[in-house]
Amino acid sequence: MKIVFWGTPKYAAENLRTIVKAGYEVIAVVTQPDRKRGRGKKLSPSPVKEAAEELSIPVYATHSISKDQKTKELLLNLKADVYLVVAFGQILPKEILDQPNLGCWNSHASLLPAWRGAAPIQWSIINADTKTGICIMSMEEGLDTGPVIEQESTIIKDSDNLEILTNRLSRMSSKLLLKSLEKIKLTKGLNKSSRLKKLNAIDQTNLKGSPSYARQITKEDNLIDWNQDAKKIIKKIQGLYPNAYTFYNAKRIKILEAIISSDNNQSKESQDIKNQSKTNRIPGEIIMINKQIGIKLMTNDYPILIKYAQLEGKKATDSYTLSIQSNLSINDKLGS
């Protein structure tokens, strides 16, 4: 069974390595072109391209597969049996979807039909979902709308950030792809309809939940609004890790880890803090700096405790060290 693998980020690269290690024949990889990354804006290959080169697999890079007639023809000539797509970053046109005789299959990091689109892991955390997962689906022209042949779920822990959850889902995806390939190879000679029937594919209209859209994350999304409630801010910091940021004295500060302050219970003291915030405290205002605990500041409701952060031009550090680097004091306001 000859496979063409489509993917771009580290998440997908781990899937590629797993498939090759399992003994499957990956005859080519399609990925996004090299892009400028890091502080020096050095032109760098995608993690999938790096993995493919390590594995001596031919690589095709394309800005737009829909417009790239040359790559389309090269792929057609490969006569692959299966296309596997994992976080490729482009929508595949029908003429590509129709090429492999055993179909095009996508591993998507959500419990479909929830969070169709480019950033399902980010939005599941930002939205404070308690559960997410992996779906293996047959690809069609719609955005992540195809019938599902495999699904596995995982609990989103309170401590999960984007990196932690992405790594867990990548391992789940690798496992489900291997399970799916074992079944797909048994459908040789069947047309698409018969193949899906043999694989017990489930139409998404018969799955739990309502459709939702996980749009691409923008730079503007990463800016923290301290006027929001504490829980919403925490979930944004976790879901956009390590990119959620604020400003102080026109310098960018990335907030890497924060928690709702542990004294935010139903005690009279806690309620007094909340009540004071309505009258005396401004969202974003620092109300405590402590060497052991860090920086505590107000939100729209309860205070949060910043544990780790990164001032632009500096390395990531604990928030007390950040307060020294930034010359922060009690009553100063972040976001300005």
From Swiss-Prot:
InterPro entries in alphabetical order: Fmt, Formyl_trans_C, Formyl_transf_N, Formyl_transf_N_sf, Formyl_transferase-like_C_sf, Met-tRNA-FMT_C, Met-tRNA-FMT_N
SUPFAM superfamilies in UniProt: FMT C-terminal domain-like, Formyltransferase
Ligand binding ((6S)-5,6,7,8-tetrahydrofolate): 110-113
Gene3D superfamilies in UniProt: 3.40.50.12230
Reaction(s) catalysed by this chain's protein: L-methionyl-tRNA(fMet) + (6R)-10-formyltetrahydrofolate = N-formyl-L-methionyl-tRNA(fMet) + (6S)-5,6,7,8-tetrahydrofolate + H(+)
Record flagged with keyword Protein biosynthesis: yes
Entry keyword annotation includes Lipid biosynthesis: no
Enzyme class: transferase
Gene Ontology MF terms in the entry: methionyl-tRNA formyltransferase activity
Alphabetically ordered keywords of this record: Protein biosynthesis, Transferase
GO CC list: cytosol
EC number: 2.1.2.9
PANTHER family cross-referenced by the UniProt entry: METHIONYL-TRNA FORMYLTRANSFERASE, METHIONYL-TRNA FORMYLTRANSFERASE, MITOCHONDRIAL
Assigned protein family: Belongs to the Fmt family.
Function comment: Attaches a formyl group to the free amino group of methionyl-tRNA(fMet). The formyl group appears to play a dual role in the initiator identity of N-formylmethionyl-tRNA by promoting its recognition by IF2 and preventing the misappropriation of this tRNA by the elongation apparatus.
UniProt-recorded name of the protein: Methionyl-tRNA formyltransferase
Gene name of this polypeptide: fmt
